[in-house]
Amino acid sequence: MAKKKNLTIDTLWKLQRAGAPSLAPDGSQAVCSLGSYSMQDNKSASALWLLSTLGGAARPLTHCGDKDGQPQWSPKGDLIAFVAKREQQGRKDDEAQLYVIAPDGGEAQRVGDIATGVEGFRWLPDGKRIAF
């Protein structure tokens, strides 16, 4: 029998943490954020991961955001919206902004530039607009 190890604070900080998943409209995939933390740097980072509900390996969808999170599928399933603090076109977000990305990957596109940042957004049923 394997020797039991105590759970320490250092071990807890090393664990990656999954954020709330969002299920694709057809139910075949889910997307969630996966966060990691560095006690040494006192910094956190997160990326979006795509998971098949039919089995198979999860794959990263985003790589370069500071805090990619709160993913939501569009009603048609052709886009995933999320909030993030990123650097794009030589400009770094001061506050979390709204981005969209296709589920098959590519570069995420900033939807707007909101001085106070974006939280708590929702797709409208037409899949063309997002309210926040």
Language model features: what each stretch is:
Residues 1-16, 53, 58:
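A short helix->beta-strand "capping" segment at the edge of beta-propeller domains
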Residues 52-56, 102-106:
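Short loop/turn segments that connect beta-strands within beta-propeller blades
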Residues 123-131:
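Structured, non-catalytic alpha/beta "coupling" segments that mediate domain-domain communication
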Residues 10-46:
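Beta-strand-rich domains and repeat architectures in extracellular enzymes and scaffolds
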Residues 27-30, 77-81, 130-131:
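Hydrophobic beta-strand positions that form the internal "hydrophobic ladder"
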Residues 34-47, 62-68, 83-99, 107, ...:
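A flexible loop/linker signature enriched in serine peptidases of the S9 family
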